[in-house]
């Protein structure tokens, strides 16, 4: 960050199926490392970083979150990225909506397709079942307990296809003890 070195001599190797945890005090650089791996703009706007990132044995330049997602990297952020007025399914499928063709879209293009809400709900239910969250896919996120919102964030990442590395930034910070235990199972 600016002229301050936040991380130095960091080396991390993760193999498929492994789970790793970074431990350290507040300000130790855990979130900074995760932001580097996900190409978050804050890294580049505060001076960038030196070094290399290898993914699947190949050096990569993760310049933004879109590039990270193309590589198969997903991230559950410390701050919620949900839209309160949307349903659970709309949040889980945001940016990856399933649509179906209409008469108008067949003439004027894809932008006039209709959301296939049953298909979106079905995908969402699979992700919610995977993490054991018994919330309705059509429920609005606004007003839900923060633990539910954290699990919805996780469901969104699980629902993505091609995920090879899933990064969690303090996933249990807002969870109750029983919710944290369920997540870690």
Put a short name on every predicted segment.
Residues 1-185:
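Glycine-rich phosphate-binding loops of nucleotide-dependent enzymes
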């Amino acid at each position: 960050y600016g002229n301050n070195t936040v991380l130095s001599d960091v080396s991390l190797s993760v193999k498929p199926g492994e789970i790793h945890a970074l431990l350290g005090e507040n300000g130790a650089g855990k979130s900074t490392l995760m932001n580097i791996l996900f190409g978050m703009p804050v890294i580049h706007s505060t001076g960038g970083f030196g070094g290399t990132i290898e993914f699947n044995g190949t050096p990569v330049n993760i310049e933004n979150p879109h590039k990270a997602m193309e590589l198969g990297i997903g991230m559950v952020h410390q701050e919620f990225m949900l839209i309160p007025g949307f349903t659970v399914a709309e949040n889980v499928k945001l940016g990856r909506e399933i649509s179906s063709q209409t008469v108008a879209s067949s003439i004027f293009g894809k932008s006039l397709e209709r959301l296939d809400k049953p298909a979106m709900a079905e995908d969402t239910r699979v992700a919610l079942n995977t993490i054991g969250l018994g919330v309705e896919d059509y429920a609005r996120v606004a007003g839900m307990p923060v633990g539910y919102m954290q699990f919805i964030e996780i469901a969104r990442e699980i629902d993505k296809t091609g995920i090879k590395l899933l990064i969690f930034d303090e996933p249990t910070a807002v969870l109750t003890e029983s919710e944290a235990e369920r997540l870690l199972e």
